[in-house]
């Protein structure tokens, strides 16, 4: 008798995991093509805060994989979009992905492709490249770790406006499911939200909430008014190391 065919095994299909994470050995085979990528791989830059401090553009998602290894992603919405052509309607799939480490970093990616898997994979890459820092704060006394936002912030996209309001410790995230997931991946534990407009449009609602939470770094609170010396940019400090790995033809 012939042996039975092995059963097909499926991977972990739970949401919120590392769906677009790097494979084993992919990081080792990464060859940086930018100065920032070469400095990160060489260990000269060890945190994303150094990148944010000098507003350095991130062009390679592997940089984020190295500096933020605990990222989690979640697919918020998948829908079909159509375009009218001479041959008829062309249908493609659009994916909206949120990514974050629940520790002050969050990103949003939107991508359209012919297949769902391709759209999700590309949206995860876009979300990694768009990761921004979040400034967290307190509702009342400055006891323990920051749990909320430092002040009220507002974001707008299309007709949707989302306002985030600090909440007392233990209140939780009072928001719609999509905005709540964005706050969780950003690391905000307690916050009130208020939204207006066509909030049924998930994409615009997420964009408005993402713009609002990103505004926490658009100003300085009084406790940050003290002058601090600005360090030199890593691209200037390690200029020779950054140029050494560049291929010359």
UniProtKB/Swiss-Prot annotation:
SUPFAM superfamilies, sorted: dsRNA-binding domain-like (SSF54768), Ribosomal protein S5 domain 2-like (SSF54211)
GO MF annotation terms: small ribosomal subunit rRNA binding; structural constituent of ribosome
Region (Disordered): 1-29
Any one Gene Ontology cellular component term annotated for this protein: cytosolic small ribosomal subunit
GO biological process: positive regulation of translational fidelity; ribosomal subunit export from nucleus; translation
Keywords, alphabetical: Cytoplasm, Ribonucleoprotein, Ribosomal protein
Main location, first listed in the record: cytoplasm
Family of this protein: Belongs to the universal ribosomal protein uS5 family.
Description of how the protein assembles with itself and partners: Component of the small ribosomal subunit. Mature ribosomes consist of a small (40S) and a large (60S) subunit. The 40S subunit contains about 32 different proteins and 1 molecule of RNA (18S). The 60S subunit contains 45 different proteins and 3 molecules of RNA (25S, 5.8S and 5S).
Function: Component of the ribosome, a large ribonucleoprotein complex responsible for the synthesis of proteins in the cell. The small ribosomal subunit (SSU) binds messenger RNAs (mRNAs) and translates the encoded message by selecting cognate aminoacyl-transfer RNA (tRNA) molecules. The large subunit (LSU) contains the ribosomal catalytic site termed the peptidyl transferase center (PTC), which catalyzes the formation of peptide bonds, thereby polymerizing the amino acids delivered by tRNAs into a polypeptide chain.
Protein name: Small ribosomal subunit protein uS5
Name of the gene: RPS21
């Amino acid at each position: 008798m012939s042996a039975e065919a092995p059963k097909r095994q499926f991977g972990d299909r739970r949401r919120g995991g590392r769906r677009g994470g790097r494979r084993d050995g992919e990081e080792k085979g990464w060859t940086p093509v930018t100065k920032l990528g070469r400095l990160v791989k060489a260990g000269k830059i060890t945190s994303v805060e150094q990148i944010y401090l000098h507003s350095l553009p991130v062009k390679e998602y592997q940089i984020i994989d190295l500096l933020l290894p605990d990222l989690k992603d979640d697919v918020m919405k998948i829908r079909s979009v159509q375009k009218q052509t001479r041959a008829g309607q062309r249908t493609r799939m659009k994916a909206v992905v949120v990514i974050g480490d629940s520790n002050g970093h969050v990103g949003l990616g939107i991508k359209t492709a012919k297949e769902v898997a391709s759209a999700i994979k590309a949206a995860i890459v876009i979300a990694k490249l768009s990761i921004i820092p979040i400034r967290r704060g307190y509702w009342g006394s400055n006891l323990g770790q920051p749990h909320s936002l430092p002040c009220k912030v507002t974001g707008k996209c299309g007709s949707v406006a989302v306002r985030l309001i600090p909440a007392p410790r233990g209140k939780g995230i009072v928001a719609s499911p999509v905005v709540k997931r964005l706050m969780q991946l950003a690391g905000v534990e307690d916050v009130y939200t208020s939204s207006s407009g066509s909030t049924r449009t998930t994409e615009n609602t997420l964009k408005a909430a993402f713009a609002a939470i990103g505004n926490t770094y658009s100003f300085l609170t009084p406790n940050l008014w003290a002058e601090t010396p600005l360090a030199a940019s890593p691209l200037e400090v390690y200029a020779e190391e950054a140029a050494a790995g560049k291929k010359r033809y």
